[in-house]
UniProtKB/Swiss-Prot annotation:
Main location (coarse class): nucleus
Similarity comment text for this entry: Belongs to the CHZ1 family.
Gene name in the database record: chz1
Protein's cellular compartments: Nucleus
Protein name per the record: Histone H2A.Z-specific chaperone chz1
Positions in coiled-coil regions: none
Function of the molecule: Forms a chaperone-bound H2A.Z-H2B complex that acts as a source for SWR1 complex-dependent H2A to H2A.Z histone replacement in chromatin.
Biased composition (Low complexity): 11-21
Organism: Neosartorya fischeri (strain ATCC 1020 / DSM 3700 / CBS 544.65 / FGSC A1164 / JCM 1740 / NRRL 181 / WB 181) (Aspergillus fischerianus)
Region (Disordered): 1-119
Length: 119
């Protein structure tokens, strides 16, 4: 049989399938993942998102958003390009505001009790 170098045709449908050779190569059919793994991933994602939401809630408390000064609002729709700014005056104004804020600080009045700091 094998001496005459003729091809032997097989009637096996699995061997002659058009994608039989391609299944072992690079682009085969994608394997279905078990549904248990998907549910575990979904649970992990929900836990992570809950943790992120808790962290984001804390960030809202620490925002130092000061109210907008009405002096900075330009009426009439004018543009601010080309406006000359007196930085000296602005620095003095900020310095005066900072001095007023320093009067309210309680840190200067704090005196630690040395007895509490012992090992």
């Amino acid at each position: 049989m094998g001496d005459n170098h003729q091809a032997t045709l097989s009637n096996d449908p699995a061997a002659n399938a058009p994608d039989a050779a391609a299944a072992d190569k690079g682009k085969g059919k994608a394997a279905d993942e078990p549904s248990l793994e998907m549910s575990m991933d979904e649970e992990e994602d929900s836990d992570e998102s809950e943790a992120e939401e808790m962290v984001n809630d804390d960030d809202d408390d620490h925002d130092n958003l000061e109210p907008i000064s009405e002096e900075n609002i330009i009426s009439g729709g004018r543009r601010t390009r080309g406006k000359t700014i007196d930085f000296q005056e602005a620095a003095e104004k900020l310095k005066a505001e900072d001095e007023m804020d320093d009067e309210d600080d309680d840190d200067e009045e704090f005196q630690p009790n040395d007895e509490d700091m012992r090992d």
